[in-house]
A protein has these predicted regions:
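A short, Lys/Arg-rich alpha-helix, primarily the initiator
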Residues: 1-16
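Key DNA-contacting residues within the recognition helix of helix-turn-helix
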Residues: 11, 36-37, 66
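Residue-level detection of the helix-turn-helix DNA-binding "recognition helix"
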Residues: 11, 15, 29, 40
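Alpha-helical residues within the helix-turn-helix
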Residues: 15, 26, 56
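Short alpha-helical DNA-recognition segment
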Residues: 19-37
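Conserved short acidic donor-positioning loop in nucleotide-sugar-dependent glycosyltransferases
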Residues: 41, 68
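DNA major-groove recognition helix of helix-turn-helix/homeodomain DNA-binding modules
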Residues: 49-64
Length: 69
């Protein structure tokens, strides 16, 4: 998945669940700057651990986070 698609997908999920970047970063236990860079497309290949943390914060699987479901 490209960083643009991941960025778009995270934004879609944040809007769906009505959660701010700050709240998502805290819930996922990742630095706000990391999440902001992923959403802006500046981090093309976030680690699997980061993807899992973000997916868990949304209560979805990594496949759904990546738009595969």
């Amino acid at each position: 998945m490209s960083s643009v698609n991941l960025s778009k997908r995270i934004k879609e999920l944040r809007n769906k669940y009505k959660i701010t970047q700050d709240r998502l970063a805290k819930k996922a236990d990742i630095p706000f700057s990391t999440l902001a860079k992923i959403e802006a497309g500046y981090t093309p290949n976030p680690s699997m651990e980061t993807l899992i943390r973000i997916a868990d914060a949304f209560g979805v699987g990594v496949d759904e986070l990546l738009g595969r479901k």
